[in-house]
Amino acid sequence: MQYKTKTFLVIFLAYLVVTNEAEAFWSFLVKAASKILPSLIGGGDDNKSSSKRKREIEDFFDPYQRELDLELERLLSQLQ
């Protein structure tokens, strides 16, 4: 009985090691496929739309940034 329990424990631990390795392997394959497939299918437009959205966000916050820059310049000129 003791022998079967130890054997079962070793097999179970080996299974955990193998599944962790398999999980890392499959996640690597999925990450690689998610990067390669859009470029093969023609998903290059996503990068353009992403940069467009980024510019829209920058334009949205840009007036506030200009006001802060002017305020900072005014404060710095007072220090000099």
Swiss-Prot record:
Keywords for the protein's UniProt record, in alphabetical order: Antimicrobial, Cleavage on pair of basic residues, Fungicide, Membrane, Secreted, Signal, Target cell membrane, Target membrane
Keyword Membrane: yes
Propeptide residue range(s): 56-80
Keyword Signal annotated: yes
Subcellular locations according to the entry: Secreted; Target cell membrane
Tissue: Expressed by the venom gland.
Annotated GO biological process: defense response to fungus; killing of cells of another organism
Superkingdom of the source species: Eukaryota
GO CC, alphabetical: extracellular region; membrane; other organism cell membrane
Residues spanning the signal sequence: 1-24
Similarity comment text for this entry: Belongs to the non-disulfide-bridged peptide (NDBP) superfamily. Medium-length antimicrobial peptide (group 3) family.
Biological role: Antimicrobial peptide. Has antifungal activity against all strains tested (MIC=12.5-200 uM). May act by disrupting the integrity of the bacterial cell membrane.
Protein name, UniProt field: Probable antimicrobial peptide clone Con10
